[in-house]
Amino acid sequence: ERAEDSGNESEGDHEELSALVDMGHDALWDVDDL
C-alpha cells in the first residue's frame, strides 16, 4: 500500500481515509439500491 511508501506520517491520514472510504462505499451501495 502507498501508506507504507509514504512512511509513518500517513498512518493517521490513512485511518481517516479508510473511514471516509467506508462511508463512501455505504453511500454508493445506497445509490445502487435506488
Curated annotation (Swiss-Prot):
UniProt entry keywords in alphabetical sequence: AIDS, Apoptosis, Host membrane, Host-virus interaction, Ion channel, Ion transport, Membrane, Phosphoprotein, Transmembrane, Transport
Alphabetical list of SUPFAM superfamilies matching this protein: HIV-1 VPU cytoplasmic domain
GO molecular function terms listed in the Swiss-Prot or TrEMBL record: CD4 receptor binding; monoatomic cation channel activity
Pfam family for this entry, one: Vpu
Cellular localisation: Host membrane
Post-translational note: Phosphorylated by host CK2. This phosphorylation is necessary for interaction with human BRCP and degradation of CD4.
InterPro entries for this protein: Vpu, Vpu_cyt_dom_sf
Compositional bias annotation for Acidic residues: 1-14
Residue positions, PTM Phosphoserine: S6, S10
Listed GO biological process terms: receptor catabolic process; viral release from host cell
A GO cellular component entry from the record: membrane
Membrane topology: Single-pass type I membrane protein
UniProt-annotated stretches for the region Disordered: 1-21
Domain of life of the organism encoding this protein: Viruses
Control of this protein's activity: Ion channel activity is inhibited by hexamethylene amiloride in vitro.
Function according to Swiss-Prot or TrEMBL: Enhances virion budding, by targeting human CD4 and Tetherin/BST2 to proteasome degradation. Degradation of CD4 prevents any unwanted premature interactions between viral Env and its receptor human CD4 in the endoplasmic reticulum. Degradation of antiretroviral protein Tetherin/BST2 is important for virion budding, as BST2 tethers new viral particles to the host cell membrane. Mechanistically, Vpu bridges either CD4 or BST2 to BTRC, a substrate recognition subunit of the Skp1/Cullin/F-box protein E3 ubiquitin ligase, induces their ubiquitination and subsequent proteasomal degradation.
Domain notes: The N-terminus and transmembrane domains are required for self-oligomerization and proper virion budding, whereas the cytoplasmic domain is required for CD4 degradation. The cytoplasmic domain is composed of 2 amphipathic alpha helix that form a U-shape.
Description of how the protein assembles with itself and partners: Homopentamer. Interacts with host CD4 and BRTC; these interactions induce proteasomal degradation of CD4. Interacts with host BST2; this interaction leads to the degradation of host BST2. Interacts with host FBXW11. Interacts with host AP1M1; this interaction plays a role in the mistrafficking and subsequent degradation of host BST2. Interacts with host RANBP2; this interaction allows Vpu to down-regulate host BLM sumoylation.
More details: HIV-1 lineages are divided in three main groups, M (for Major), O (for Outlier), and N (for New, or Non-M, Non-O). The vast majority of strains found worldwide belong to the group M. Group O seems to be endemic to and largely confined to Cameroon and neighboring countries in West Central Africa, where these viruses represent a small minority of HIV-1 strains. The group N is represented by a limited number of isolates from Cameroonian persons. The group M is further subdivided in 9 clades or subtypes (A to D, F to H, J and K).
Protein family according to the UniProt entry: Belongs to the HIV-1 VPU protein family.
Name under which the protein is recorded: Protein Vpu
Upper taxonomic lineage: Viruses, Riboviria, Pararnavirae, Artverviricota, Revtraviricetes
